[in-house]
Amino acid sequence: MEKARKEQLIREYATHEGDTGSPEVQVALLTERINHLNEHLKEHKKDHHSRRGLLMMVGKRRGLLNYLKEHDIERYRSLIKRLGLRK
C-alpha cells in the first residue's frame, strides 16, 4: 500500500486528530490490504504463503470488528456500512 493511500485512509476513518490506532482505522487499513491481496491471489493461485497472510489478516480484522461490536454497536454499524462489508 502506498504511503499516500495509507494517510488518506487514516484521515478518512480517524475518530480524532492524530488517531492511527482506533479500531476503525485498523479495520480500514486491513480491508485495503485484504482487497489488494485478493487481487494478487486471483492471478497467482498457488501463492500459498500469501494466502496464509490473507487468512491471518481476515482473522485480525474479524477480531477488531467483534471488539467494536461488543463495545460500541453504532460505530460498528457505521464502519461496516462505510467499508461495504457484511452484505
Curated annotation (Swiss-Prot):
Pfam families assigned to the protein according to its UniProt record, in alphabetical order: Ribosomal_S15
Stored PROSITE patterns: RIBOSOMAL_S15 (PS00362)
Xref: Gene3D superfamilies: 6.10.250.3130, S15/NS1, RNA-binding (1.10.287.10)
Region (Disordered): 1-22
Domain of life: Bacteria
Molecular function terms from GO: rRNA binding; structural constituent of ribosome
Biological process, per Gene Ontology: translation
InterPro entries: Ribosomal_uS15 (IPR000589), Ribosomal_uS15_bac-type (IPR005290), uS15_NS1_RNA-bd_sf (IPR009068)
Signal peptide interval: none
Function according to Swiss-Prot or TrEMBL: One of the primary rRNA binding proteins, it binds directly to 16S rRNA where it helps nucleate assembly of the platform of the 30S subunit by binding and bridging several RNA helices of the 16S rRNA. Forms an intersubunit bridge (bridge B4) with the 23S rRNA of the 50S subunit in the ribosome.
NCBIfam families: S15_bact
Protein family membership: Belongs to the universal ribosomal protein uS15 family.
Protein name (record): Small ribosomal subunit protein uS15
Source organism (scientific name): Clostridium novyi (strain NT)
